[in-house]
Each structure stands twice: as C-alpha cells, then as structure tokens.
C-alpha cells in the first residue's frame, strides 16, 4: 500500500508539471520571447524543481493538517485523495485546459472530510476565499495597468530594447515557474507527509523531480492554450502577467497558503485581453470552457474521493445511492434542457407543427 501511495503521488506530480507548464511559461511563449515549446518546457522544469526544493515545505503543512485532522490520513486515504485529484487534473490536461492543482487536491481532501464528518470548515472558507480573491486581483491589476499603458501609449519599438524585454520576460517566467514549485508540489506530497511515508525534505525533492518530468512530457497542449489561444500580448504585457503571477503566488507560499496559479495566470491573460478587446474576450470558447472547468473540477474530485471512501472504507451504500441519483438527475436535467432548446430553435427556424 505504501508503494501504491508513492506511485499515485508521483503520477499526480507529473500532472502538476503539465498544468504548471502553461501557467508559468505560457506568457513567455505567447509573446515570442521564447519561440520553441521544448525550450519553454525545459526552463519551466528547472524553475519548478528549484521552487519545490527550496521553498515547497510551507504549503505542505496546510495540505496535510489544515483541512482535516492529520490522524485521519492513512495510506489508503492518501491513495484516494491523490487518485481523485490526479484523475481530475489528468482529464483537464487532456482537454488542454490549465487547471489549479490546489483546487482538485483540496476538493479531494474535503471529500474525505465530508465522508468522516471531520472537516475544518473555517480553514476551508479561508482557502476558498483566496481562490476567489487572488485571481480577481490578478485580473483587475493587469487590466488596470494595461489600460494605463494604452492610455499613455507606452510602447517599446527599438530592437535592442525588445531584446532586453525578452530577457526580462524569461526571468519573470522562470520565477513564475519557481513559484509553481513552491506552491503546487505540496499538493502531491502533502498527503504522504501527513501519513508519515516521507518527510518534507524527501517529499519536495522527489515531488519536484516528477513535476519537472511532467512539464517536459505532458505540458505542450496546456502551454499552447495559455500562450496562443486566449489573446495575443507584447513582451511588456508578458512581463506584467508573469510578474503578477509570480509575486502573488510566492507571497502566498511563504504564508503556507495554497493558491490557484493556473487561474492567476489565466485571469491575468484575460485581463490583458479585455483591456485590448473589451468584453469580447469572454465570448471566446476557450475562455468559457476554462471558467466551467474551474468551477466543476473541485466538485468532481470531491465527489470521487467521497464515493471511494463511502464504498471501500465505510460501506455506506445509502450515501452512494443518493449521490448516484443526484448525478443521474442532474445529467437528465441537462439533457432535457438541451433537447428543449434544440426543439425551440427548430420551431423558430422551420415553423411549428408535426
């Protein structure tokens, strides 16, 4: 069981790397400061590994004991938490959507807490408030500063200054990757530390190594989404984006607070897009999909972990029956709504009657 828990955690760490690749280097790649995906992913891998080893220990304490009592987390619970979170994150990576590992990990831990009725609700509310406030602050800050740039017509056109901006942007991207290592590796190794499988030092070392590997092997599609599909931006705007994300996440990590780096960066990019194109940026399908995935994902990992605990550890078949019924009812309601809308469009276009 211990080996299975470690393998689950390392698999999850690889998926963290894939998601963090877009969050940290998507800006530099999208602005043209670094043109090849492979180089961007290598720089990301080095940054996240360094961040995990140097400063990844503080958030571990929050993940391991700040949401549910530490003694609740056994090896079996570790497998359930990591498995539920990894499945949610892996699905998002296949869709090419940048997703916060903090969301799915906390969601999985909450599912265990709900099953055993040992949830620290006040701490959870604080964490969720950070999930809302930090991306909104990033969005508002980048929108406001970008508007100032455009109002005062601040532009850098000389090739020499453009090269300097490119170097500064790469440095900012590296520090954003560093912040990802500080904040997100704890999501993979925190449950292992709580269960006593690894100490903090070994956990961050092994976790950091596999996060770096995941960035190299699985990060291409998410990198493309953040770098090319949401909006276009200059090197100066890229520095603003990466600097904002790195600063917010590093400060949060120092205080041991898990925050959604992927959402911070993506929200900053949307802020730039809105400053340039207005509210039309929200009409892009990729933005709408991202917002939906962000909302659904923590509830998905919560539901998976809750069901696994109820099925294999508590044999609480009544709760499982209720959850399955709710899911079937929700799916049926969604399907019915789509059918009604389709019928109304058909009547509007072709006229009524049978």
Curated annotation (Swiss-Prot):
What GO molecular function annotation could you give as one example from this UniProt entry?
A: phosphate transmembrane transporter activity
> What Pfam family does this protein match (any one)?
PHO4
The answer to whether UniProt assigns keyword DNA-binding to this entry is no
Per UniProt, the keywords (alphabetical) are: Cell membrane, Membrane, Sulfate transport, Transmembrane, Transmembrane helix, Transport
- Return the protein name: Sulfate permease CysP
| Natural source organism | Bacillus subtilis (strain 168)
| Subcellular location, record wording | Cell membrane
Give the principal location in a single coarse category.
Answer: membrane
PANTHER family named among the record's database cross-references: PHOSPHATE TRANSPORTER
Topology in the lipid bilayer is annotated as: Multi-pass membrane protein
Q: Does the keyword Transport apply?
A: yes
Q: Which GO biological process annotations does it have?
A: phosphate ion transmembrane transport
**One GO CC term, this protein:** plasma membrane
- Role this protein plays: Involved in the import of sulfate.
Q: Membrane-spanning regions, if any?
A: 3-23, 40-60, 77-97, 125-145, 164-184, 197-217, 293-313, 320-340
Question: What inducers act on this gene?
Answer: Up-regulated by sulfur starvation and repressed by cysteine. Also induced by O-acetyl-L-serine (OAS), a direct precursor of cysteine, maybe via inactivation of a putative transcriptional repressor of the cysH operon whose activity is controlled by the intracellular levels of OAS.
Give the protein family: Belongs to the inorganic phosphate transporter (PiT) (TC 2.A.20) family.
* Source domain of life: Bacteria
């Amino acid at each position: 069981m211990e080996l299975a828990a470690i393998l689950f955690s390392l698999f999850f760490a690889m998926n963290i790397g894939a998601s963090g690749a877009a969050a940290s280097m998507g800006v530099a790649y999208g602005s043209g400061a670094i043109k090849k995906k492979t180089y961007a992913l290598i720089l990301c891998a080095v940054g996240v590994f360094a961040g995990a080893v140097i400063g990844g220990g503080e958030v571990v304490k929050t993940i391991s004991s700040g949401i549910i009592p530490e003694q609740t987390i056994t090896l079996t619970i570790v497998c359930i938490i990591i498995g539920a979170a990894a499945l949610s994150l892996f699905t998002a990576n296949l869709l090419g959507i940048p997703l916060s590992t903090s969301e799915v990990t906390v969601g999985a831990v909450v599912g265990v807490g709900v099953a055993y009725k040992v949830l620290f609700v006040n701490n959870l509310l604080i964490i969720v408030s950070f999930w809302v406030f930090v991306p909104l602050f990033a969005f508002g800050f980048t929108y406001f500063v970008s508007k100032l740039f455009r109002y005062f017509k601040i532009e850098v056109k000389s090739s020499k200054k453009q090269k300097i901006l490119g170097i500064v942007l790469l440095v900012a991207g590296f520090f954003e990757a560093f912040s990802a290592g500080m904040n997100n590796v704890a999501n993979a190794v925190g449950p292992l530390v709580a269960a006593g499988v690894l100490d903090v030092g070994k956990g961050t070392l092994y976790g950091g190594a596999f996060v770096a590997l995941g960035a190299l092997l699985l990060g291409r599609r998410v990198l493309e989404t953040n770098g090319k599909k949401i909006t276009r931006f200059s090197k100066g705007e890229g520095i603003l984006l990466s600097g904002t994300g790195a600063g917010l996440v590093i400060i949060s990590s120092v205080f041991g607070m898990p925050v959604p780096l992927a959402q911070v960066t993506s929200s900053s990019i949307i802020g730039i897009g809105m400053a340039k194109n207005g509210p039309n940026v929200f009409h892009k399908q990729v933005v709408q999909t991202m917002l939906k995935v962000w909302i659904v994902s923590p509830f998905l990992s919560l539901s998976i972990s809750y069901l696994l605990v109820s099925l294999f550890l508590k044999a609480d078949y009544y709760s499982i029956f209720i959850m399955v019924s709710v899911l079937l009812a929700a799916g049926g309601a969604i399907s019915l709504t789509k059918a009604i809308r389709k019928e109304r469009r058909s009547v509007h276009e072709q006229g009524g009657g049978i």
